[in-house]
Amino acid sequence: MYSNPNNFFGGNAMGPGAPQYGAGQPQQQQQQQQQPDPFAPQPTGFAQAPLQQQYTGYPGLQAPQGQLQPQFTGYGQTPQQGMATGAPPMPAIPQQYQQQFQQQQTQQQQPQQQQMPFAAAPPQPTQTLAPPPPVKPQATGFSEMAASFHAGGGARSQPSAAPRKANTVPNIRLSFITAPDQAKFETLFKSAVGDGQTTMSGEKARDLLLRSRLDGDSLSHIWTLADTTRSGQLHFPEFALAMYLCNLKLTGKSLPPSLPDNIKNEVSSMVDIINFSIAEESGSASATSTNAPDFGVRQNTATPPVIQHPQPQPSSSQLLQAQMTGFPAQQTGFMGQGLQPQQTGMPQATGYTGPRPPMPPMPTGFGSNLSPNVGPGGMIAPLNAQPTGRPGQWGLVNTPATGLPNIDALQARMMPQQGREQQDYTTAGLQGNAVIPWAITKDEKTRYDALFRAWDGLNKGYIGGDQAIEIFGQSGLEKPDLERAWTLADHGNKGRLDLDEFAVAMHLIYRKLNGYPIPNQLPPELVPPSTRNFNESLGTIKNMLHKESDFRKNSGASLLPQKTGVSYLKNHSFRGTGGASGNRKDATVFKNNDDAVGYRSSARRRVGNASPRPESPASVGSNEELSLDQLRKKIKEKQVLLDAMDFADEKNMEEDDILDRRDRREAEELYRRIRRIQEDIDNHPDASPIGGDSEAERRALKRQLQNLTDKIPELASQVRKTEKAIADARLELFRLKDAKAHPGSAAAIVGTGPGGAITESDRLKARAKAMMQQRTAALTGKKIDVTSDQDAEKRLEEESIKARTEKENNERMVRDVEDSVRDFAKGIEDNLKEGGQDSTTEHEKRRWEDALGVEDEVRDFIYDLQRSSRASRIRSQDRQGGRKATQEPVSAEAPPTARVDSPASISRTASPAAPPAAGGSYSSYKTPEERAAFIKQQAEQRMAERLAALGIKAPTKPGETAAQRAEREQAERAAKLRQAEEEDARRETERQARLAEEQGVPPPAVSQAAKPEGKKPPPPPSRKAAKPDDRRAEEELATKKAEEERLERERGEQERATRELESQAKAQEDELAKEREEADARLRALEEQVRQGKLKKEEEKRKKKAALAEAKEKEAQLAQRRAEIEAARKREEELRRQLEAMDDDSSSDDEGPEQITPQASTPTMNDSHIVNREPERQPTPPPAPVVSPPQIVTSSPPTEGESRNPYFRMMSHSSDASPATAPAPPVAPPVAPPAPPQPEASTNPFHRIAQAPAPETSPVPVTRRRPDDDGWGSDKDEEDEESDDDRPGGKSAAALASILFGTMAPPRPLSATGDKSATSPTVSSPVAPPPESASPPAASPSAPPPPPPMPGSFPSASPGPGAPPPPPPPPPPMPSAGGPPGAPPAPPPPPPGMAPPAPPPPPPAGGPPAAAPAGGRPAGLLGQIQAGKALKKTTTRDKSAAAVAGRVLD
């Protein structure tokens, strides 16, 4: 029965939607708890029993006061008995409670008293009885918490018998001193002031301050700063400030001249709190403080029913005992566990929670709400987004990397739960050692906000002290820690915590659970933004109020503001400067003015609109009160006033007329000045053009500029290509000239490098050729002039350097031109951009140039000014047209006649003819045709100026004679003059008419009639207007006369100035005409000089070309003669050799192929080429020499074989390529079939074997001679082989290779297949096929050699259709070596150089080295060899072979 209402009470009090314990609802709690009559005694008795025991302990400071303890003790016992009737088990509870408290409080009494030395005594509304001593320490913990929450509230709730110390010093922290210092100063202040006093007298303060042993000046300054109220007494904050200043001085720091604003505001605020609290304390001593958890009220009201209702339950005593056992721990914990005592309340809570197992239903209301939230994070998820609005203001930080351990457990424990009152909370499971930052993390804020909303069921926006005791107590911390956390979080000692402050308190608790001490002062990271901003705003308002009070005090305005007229309202603005502004009246300076009469409408008293308005009775007395004389007097006075008004009006009108005339004169003067300035602009040579630049024109110019800029790279590339071609041509020309001047030099070397440069490979080839020539000369016995190629190379290098230098200079010039053009284009583009119009310039242009948005008079003036400016430009252009007439363009779209017909178009199209100084520009033309004509004219003019600077006469227009041009220019000038005269005449007429209208000189009546139109004010009364009209007319006549005289003078001056300008213009025209004639003469002279120079250059070129052609012709003839001589000589040798071969054919029939094959190898071919190249060095290479037709016909077999045999094709290419490198006049190039040049010879050793296979005959004896000497062996080897002369090829490796691989090679080269029909009769002579097949290989190994077979050798060498069949085919078709090496007779041994060519050794050994001995033999050497001369005597080969052997010729 009792548990239900009890539960209902608990549910209401602790539910999320109900106010919490001690939330100012003690009566409601009592009513709910006590359904029967014993309502009043029940709370009284209940509160006295346990509450007073805890209260006895609660006032920890009041331990020495014995009255309080007996008061509580006795009172507690009495109601227990009275309440025992309602609940029998209750009487035993206090005794056990007292025993438990004796054990706990004896341990806690001393520490609690030390922790809260300034705690206020708890309120006790009942009489004091003697309690047991242990209850006092238990209450000490509660008094400590209450002291931290109250600002003197404990004393107010205490009966009058209790001391009033708490009222003297509010529990407010001063920021400029530390907490320990404030505690010391408070103790000292209380000891000096005594009980019940709030201020310290000046004498006591002086005694205390003198103990600091500071000098008098310092103490005087300290007193001045500390006594902020100027009352001669010190409140506690002022005393603390004085002690703080003394400490500053003692530590060696200087005293500030004035207090900082924050210190001054703190001190004044605390002083005001102390002064305001005095009246409240005297008014109601038993009133409880609303700024802290209300422990006293809950003890007196809420707790008794809680204990009484559970008493009927049989198990209540057991539960109470268990709770008791829990309560001591809770109490010790409530210094440590904190908030359970809140539920158990004060000691109330002990009895309340202890005996109340049914109380769980009270949290059952919470339990229902909290059961879903018990799980960690139950309400966190939906509220995660809520703190996101705060981080930017509060500086929330991210969760540390280590996480937030036990935060979920803390949240789960502190959520409203069922049965929390019975639990004994400890820190077990919540403690940790995590790194927790000072600032609140976002995760923490989310959880704390969820916890706050769970407890704030009614959405009041705050958590009261009772709820805080219950919530924080569940953390298991001791009471002092929780009290300090509450004190730091409850800013302003409001007694409740809002959302941010609750988060701060929870964060401090969480830090404490992780081993961090609770600070003495809240760090800046934890100050909520609302608190911080509120403090700043409070400081600002306080400063404003201080300044205002000082201003009022100093100015004396505080005495009688209505008399001084000083308005306080002006100084109340947050944004104002504080100074007086204007004489505006407001409520602070209001004073009634009897003279100020309010408006009173009389319209309702009028009968009709025509009725006069009656005079206001407030200002005029009633007519009935005035006599007739008074009325007449008033009428006279009014008449006088009216006359004065008329005079004033006339005077004002005259003044207005004078001002109007002056303004008109000033305007006319401005007009004249503007016209003069415009004329100066038009006539000045450096004046900027007139006319607006349209955006379309600007864009067109930009596009044109871009197109021209894009052409620059292409032009530069073309210039560079031309420069390169010029340099190459110069080098080639120099080579030709040098070869002509030095025929025997090595300048004939053709460079294969870049740009025709001679590379090292070219030099190696040249040296190899020269050495071959020397060896050939040694063999033939001819003398060859060996010239060093150093001079030629040096000359060519110098010329190359010159050409390269000139090319680089030209390239630099081209780059400079490119850079300058780019800079110029960039400048033009920047000018075009800068000239762009923005909105302001466009508006100004439309207003002052297009006359939009101006008055009619100004618009007419603008149009007239534009017309005069245009006419002036035309005249100036015509004056200067004599000099620039040749450059005036004729627009293709508008012929001259059209220009004459259309003056406007004339003025626009003719202006381009004027130079820029005349004022015309591209922007002054409105149509595309005019602009195109202007651009064309400007381009022609600039081109003419440049040509004139170069001495070249400017070209005239095509299709226009001088007479036509003169007529056109004359017609244009006449049209311009006529148009200008018409414009001047019309402008002068308009000006005269305008002056006549404005001044009214010619027709005075008209001017008088026109004048009053808009200038005269309403005329004055007619009765006195005659005289002013006469005076005004006289003044106007005088003014008009003066103005007319002045105009006449100005007209004369203008005429004189015009005549002077015309004379100056004429003189300028004469000077310009003279200058033009002189320029024409100079141009003609320069043009004649240029023409003569061109003729001379052309004549010189023709002479040079003729001389060069003659020289070439002579050289060609000389080369042709030499070629003919050489061909005849070689033809003779070839015929002689063939005859000898025919004689010996029968004896050497078997060995012929072996002997011929090596003889037809590469050395023979190279030999012949070297011999043939000897005469080629002398002249420059002429065209192909003339050769006999039979020689050309014999070249068909090689051509035939060229299309099938790949090796032969390669060798024929190399032989054909040789003429490209060193063309020789005696050689017949037409003989060689055309093929792409192949300077590189094949290095494949089998290449020669395949090209020179042995015929299918009986093998020749094999020799074991080593081919390492490549046929250039020593004399000893040659002597050993003398006995084998009858077998020329037997002892050579080439012969051995040919024998071994003869069957492996193709049976016959494809080049010789076509010869079977022609050579069939001579099959018995094996000499015929080998020469055919061997002739191609002869050319392949050596790239340098000249064209293939010489003409003299082909008729006999190739038994083609055109060759006579009887003679056997000779050895290889070499021009000069065909005779000797190819001798078929067996007896003569082959020369040493003949054998090596075919074997596999590298081509250098078998190529050019072997060619020297065989190639240089003249025709007479064959007879000597046949006579028995040994070839070993030719020792010169060894010397030359050593120099060239092993070299690879590219």
From Swiss-Prot:
Residues 214-249, 477-512 form the EF-hand domain. Residues 1141-1153, 1276-1285 have a biased composition (Acidic residues). Keywords: Actin-binding, Cell membrane, Coiled coil, Cytoplasm, Cytoskeleton, Endocytosis, Endosome, Membrane, Repeat. Residues 15-37, 59-71, 93-119, 902-924 have a biased composition (Low complexity). One of its GO terms (biological process) is endocytosis. SMART domains: EFh, EH. Its main location: membrane. InterPro entries: EF-hand-dom_pair, EF_hand_dom, EH_dom, WH2_dom. Residues 622-741, 960-1148 form a coiled coil. GO terms for molecular function: actin binding; calcium ion binding. Residues 72-83, 1156-1169, 1314-1323 have a biased composition (Polar residues). GO terms for cellular component: actin cortical patch; endosome membrane; plasma membrane. Residues 1417-1434 form the WH2 domain. It is a peripheral membrane protein. Residues 181-270, 444-533 form the EH domain. Residues 788-850, 965-997, 1026-1101, 1110-1140, 1265-1275 have a biased composition (Basic and acidic residues). It is found in: Cell membrane; Endosome membrane; Cytoplasm, Cytoskeleton, Actin patch. It comes from the Eukaryota. Residues 120-136, 1178-1188, 1222-1239, 1327-1352, 1361-1375, 1381-1411 have a biased composition (Pro residues). Residues 1-140, 600-625, 788-851, 865-1450 are annotated as: Disordered. The keyword Repeat applies. SUPFAM superfamilies: EF-hand. Belongs to the PAN1 family. Component of the PAN1 actin cytoskeleton-regulatory complex. Component of the PAN1 actin cytoskeleton-regulatory complex required for the internalization of endosomes during actin-coupled endocytosis. The complex links the site of endocytosis to the cell membrane-associated actin cytoskeleton. Mediates uptake of external molecules and vacuolar degradation of plasma membrane proteins. Plays a role in the proper organization of the cell membrane-associated actin cytoskeleton and promotes its destabilization. This is Actin cytoskeleton-regulatory complex protein PAN1. It comes from Chaetomium globosum (strain ATCC 6205 / CBS 148.51 / DSM 1962 / NBRC 6347 / NRRL 1970) (Soil fungus).
